[in-house]
Structures are given as C-alpha cells and as structure tokens.
Design a protein with these regions (language model features):
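Non-catalytic C-terminal interaction segments of nucleic acid-processing enzymes
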Residues: 2-21, 25-39, 47-48, 184-192, ...
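Short glycine/proline-enriched coil/turn segments at helix->beta-strand junctions
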Residues: 56, 125-126, 199-203
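Acidic, glycine-rich loop-and-strand cores that form catalytic or ligand-binding grooves
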Residues: 120, 124
C-alpha cells in the first residue's frame, strides 16, 4: 500500500495567479513538489530542516523549492519561532492536493507538537522494518475526517501506522496508534488516554516521548494488566523532534 503522499496526485501544470507576472506561463510540478505539498497538508505545516529530510534534499535547497510553491500561490512561509523558517499551504495549495482542510499559518502554541509529530513520522519511515513492511502513515487530519460526528467515540491518536497484509510480514494487517508526548501530563490523564486506545482495535500503541514525558508515560503503561501493557511501546523521540532551546 503506498504512502499517503503518493495517493494524492497533483495536477502537473498550474497557471500562475496573475497574468501580469514577468514569468507568465505554467509552472510544472514534479513528484518532489507533490510529495512536499501533500506532506504540508497532512502535517499542518513543516519547518525547513524537516521538510528537507522529507524531500530528501539538502536544507539549503528547500528555500528555492518553497519559493516556487509560493510564486505559484500554493504555499506561504515565515519565521514563526527561533530556528528554521516554516512553510504551510495556502487555500489554493490545499485545493490543489484535493483536501478541504483549513489552510493557514500554524498556531504558535502548536508549533512544538507539529514539529515533533513530523519528526516522529520521519523517524519511523526511516526504519528498515517500515520499508520492508510497506507501512504507511495515516495523519491526524485524516483520522478526524474519518470520524466526523459524535457517533464515533474514542480518543483520536496523533497518527496511525497501517501495515498491509504482505505475506511474511511480522506486522501484516496490523494498525498501530501513535502518540507523541513532549511534556508530562498528570498520570491519571495519561492512563485514561491509554485505556481509551486499548479499547480500540490497535495491535500496538506507540508512545514517542521527549525525555521530560518519558517517566509518567512509562509508569502509566505499566499500570495495566500484563497483556494490555504488552501492547504499549514507549520510546524516546529523536532529538530532531524538539524545538530549538527545548529541554
């Protein structure tokens, strides 16, 4: 089963927004552009350094790639916090990738979490087991879109990992829930979240935690019956997940 970004073909030609532009003509979008634009839609926004990893280019090339998107009216960029610039889709860019989600600068209060979830995704996608199992990432926005009403109970995780039913795959047919934790929550709240996820048909509940959040999540995961605790994997987030200056 392909990754999400390959499920959203982007029109290869896009007319520029104004006929008065000096480079009037059509901008040809390549596969890399499609991957990047769909990633921005899925993940709300992306900082340049992680976008470079996602596109498999040197970080200094991202500026030019984003400039092409911006000139085409598909994306916007800005300095939202200490560290690299950020990029996000415009409404035209969101329409281009085929979604009706909001297209706007990410809220400053959510930057750290958005960065951490994208870094977690890149971390998982870089693992050999991911490639061998042809796993794919189902983002929070897609999960929320699939549960539009109050008739769909249950905690919505930060993402799901879907493992297709490939013969010989140790994870064939499994669905994992992914939770990204940056700061410690009250123990009772973490236990309620884990309990809600255990009640859903997830084979694994994967917690990727910043160092500050690791102890409480580890403790909460150990407070369930052994067969339930065995479904909860607690791991440390990669250092790239943390905002500059974060502990």
């Amino acid at each position: 089963m392909p990754h999400h970004h390959s499920q959203n073909p982007v029109n290869p030609e896009l007319s520029p927004p104004s006929p008065r532009r000096s480079d009037a003509g059509k901008i040809r979008l390549q596969r890399r552009d499609a991957d990047g634009l769909v990633t921005l839609a899925d993940m709300y926004a992306a900082p340049y350094d992680l976008l470079a990893v996602r596109l498999d280019v040197a970080e200094d090339r991202v500026r030019g790639i984003v400039a092409r998107w911006r000139d085409a009216g598909l994306a916007a960029n800005g300095k939202l916090a200490e560290g690299p610039q950020w990029c996000w889709l415009t409404p035209a860019g969101m329409r281009q990738v085929g979604h009706g989600w909001e297209a706007a600068p990410p809220p400053l209060a959510r930057l750290a979490h958005i960065r951490a979830v994208l870094a977690a995704r890149l971390f998982m996608e870089g693992d050999a087991a991911w490639t061998a199992g042809r796993a794919w990432w189902r983002c929070e926005r897609r999960l929320r879109a699939s549960r539009p009403g109050v008739g769909q109970p249950g905690h919505i995780p930060d993402a799901e990992i879907l493992w297709p039913s490939i013969p010989g795959s140790p994870r064939a047919g499994e669905t994992w829930a992914v939770e990204v934790e940056l700061t410690p929550k009250p123990l009772a709240r973490v236990q309620r979240i884990i309990s809600g996820l255990l009640a859903q048909p997830y084979a694994v509940i994967l917690y990727l935690c910043a160092p500050a959040a690791l102890p409480v999540v580890t403790q909460a995961a150990g407070n369930f019956r052994p067969e339930q605790s065995a479904r909860v994997l607690v791991r440390t987030l990669p250092s790239a997940a943390l905002m500059r200056g974060a502990a």
